[in-house]
Amino acid sequence: MTDKHSLRRRGYVLLLLGLLFLLPGCREKPAAKAPGGYDVVDDRGRTIHFDAKPQRVYGNTLSLEEVLLDLLPPERIAAVSPPTLDPEYSLAADKAARVAGRVPAYPGPEPIAALQPDLIFAQLRARPETIATLEEMGFKVFCMEVPTNLDMVRKRLRQMSEAVGEPERGQALLAELDEKVAYVKSRTADIPPEKRRVLLGFSSMGAFGHPDGLFHDICRQSGVINGAARIHMAYGSHLSDEQILQIDPDIMMFVDDGAANDYGGQIRDRVLGDPALQTAKAVKNRRFFFLKDRYRASNTQHMGDAILQIARNVYPDAFTESGTAK
């Protein structure tokens, strides 16, 4: 009997303790988020909170650094890398020179952590172990898809400007980009289908332009037909002479890598001098132009400049006062 009463009393005690635990103020409260600030969501769906605008921002690729250099003053950028300082490859080399910090190209987590950034922009193609290590160390990493078309570039500009707390500046960059795209369209929209020219681009690695890549959309926005997409060129593949003849481009584009490839001259000489390509229309007519490498895959606010460069070279007559392509 005593045991029964004892067990019953213990049960009452445990029940009371449980009720007390549930009452407000009787258990530890989770830490409350600081009032104010703002939240942003990256392309992984992860929410990042900022109590104030980040002051030491780092982007881990040339293209991310180029965006930051037009969004922020140099003192809010933690560091830039050698490619961003090189005018052969960078469209923001002059602004990059005003940033105090330096970091190697494609750094691991240690050099990035040494910068003590309060926001890191990274592309989803970046090494996942680097991103994971930085996040484990407590750094805020905003991950984004690599843009492969104009809409994705627009999205990137909006995301980055919102993350750094400068949405108005982002809107200004978008307006500049859209103005250039609209200008090209106004000059090329009336070119009939039969006068649309087929362009084939060549880098030091050979012909390029697979249909899912950014260059394809740059061509499309320029009113130009991307020759490589005509035969559904796969990413990372190379075109044979037979495939180039099958495309039979109206005009060829040679990437200017600076002094390393004689400013595109080495590619030109190799392609135009290939005996197997002498019947190709562009080779016979010597129709070609050079494009700086920094424009070829410009997935930043400078995409509008790349579109304009290609359109002007392919349809020079459309950009005269009469504005009629021949």
Language-model-detected regions and their locations in the chain:
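Bacterial N-terminal signal peptides that target proteins for export
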Residues: 2-13
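Bacterial N-terminal signal peptides
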Residues: 13-22
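Extracytoplasmic substrate-binding proteins
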Residues: 26, 47, 129-207, 228-229, ...
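Short helix-initiation/N-cap motifs at beta->coil->alpha
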Residues: 43-45, 99-110, 147, 232-241
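A short, structured surface patch at a secondary-structure boundary
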Residues: 58-115, 119-124, 227
